[in-house]
């Protein structure tokens, strides 16, 4: 597990590097599906002092199997996503400013241009509000459930992120690095959408044919963007 712990540590350290977190407001995890184990950031440990061996290993029930700290308080959300979506290898949660602003507004991040379409096939959805019972019950698990409910039958790697109503963004990917990459992009397109809507409040979404072209040239069966 040491290699995966290093990957998760590096991915967590990318959060302050890319300006996605303040203090300890964020966490990254990754899964070893063969072993059924997840590596995740410890709860409340400052990035400035965090080390590789501080990463916590949990099983799919959230039981700690390795590590001296408690795992992230959002662990149950991460586990719910891994259990529902076999294609996910990494999950990240932040409170990055612009993506969180859309979450607090209770609005999806609209697909307005090609930067968005290069990564997200359509709007980045916003979940419904959790009920008082859901919050007072198994809050973090119910957060995972409302994400799953909102995504429905969408392929999660085609919509690799979401904003949870009045909470903040979650993103995911093939591995921890990919999840952080998508979280960075989500914050950037959230900022772009906010600026663009300020310039032109009547702005229309990106045309479907342009969105399809940009997404499929990177992610479709005949993708040709980048190097093989």
UniProtKB/Swiss-Prot annotation:
Catalytic activity from the UniProt record: L-ribulose 5-phosphate = D-xylulose 5-phosphate
Pathway: Cofactor degradation; L-ascorbate degradation; D-xylulose 5-phosphate from L-ascorbate: step 4/4
GO CC, one annotated term: cytosol
EC numbers on record: 5.1.3.4
Any one GO molecular-function label of the UniProt entry: aldehyde-lyase activity
Entry-linked Pfam families: Aldolase_II
Residues making up the signal peptide according to the UniProt record: none
CDD domains: Aldolase_II (cd00398)
Induction context: Induced by L-ascorbate. Repressed by UlaR.
InterPro entries assigned to the protein according to its UniProt record, in alphabetical order: Aldolase_class_II_sugar_metab, Aldolase_II/adducin_N, Aldolase_II/adducin_N_sf, UlaF
SMART domains: Aldolase_II
Domain of life, per lineage: Bacteria
Active-site feature positions: 118 (proton donor/acceptor), 225 (proton donor/acceptor)
Obligatory cofactor(s): Zn(2+)
This protein's UniProt keywords: Carbohydrate metabolism, Isomerase, Metal-binding, Zinc
Binding site for substrate: 26-27, 43-44, 72-73
Family: Belongs to the aldolase class II family. AraD/FucA subfamily.
PANTHER family documented for this protein: FUCULOSE PHOSPHATE ALDOLASE, L-RIBULOSE-5-PHOSPHATE 4-EPIMERASE ULAF
Name under which the protein is recorded: L-ribulose-5-phosphate 4-epimerase UlaF
């Amino acid at each position: 597990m040491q290699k995966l712990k290093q990957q998760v540590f590096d991915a967590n350290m990318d959060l302050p590097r890319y300006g996605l977190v303040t203090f300890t407001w964020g966490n990254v995890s990754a899964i070893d599906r063969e072993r059924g184990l997840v590596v995740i950031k410890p709860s409340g440990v400052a990035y400035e002092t965090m080390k590789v061996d501080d990463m916590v290993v949990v099983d799919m029930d959230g039981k700690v199997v390795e590590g001296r700290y408690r795992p992230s308080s959002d662990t149950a959300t991460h586990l719910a996503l891994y259990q529902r979506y076999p294609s996910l290898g990494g999950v990240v949660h932040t409170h990055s400013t612009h993506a969180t602003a859309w979450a607090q507004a209770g609005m999806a991040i609209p697909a307005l241009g090609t930067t968005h379409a290069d990564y997200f096939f359509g709007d980045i959805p916003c979940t419904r509000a959790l009920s008082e019972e859901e919050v007072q019950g198994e809050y973090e698990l119910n957060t995972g459930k409302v994400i799953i409910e909102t995504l429905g039958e969408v392929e999660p790697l085609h919509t690799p992120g979401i904003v949870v109503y009045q909470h903040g963004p979650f993103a995911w990917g093939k591995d921890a690095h990919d999840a952080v990459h998508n979280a960075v992009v989500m914050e950037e397109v959230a900022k772009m959408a906010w600026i663009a809507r300020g310039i032109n409040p009547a702005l229309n979404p990106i045309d479907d044919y342009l969105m399809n072209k940009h997404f499929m040239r990177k992610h479709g069966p005949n993708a040709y963007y980048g190097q093989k």
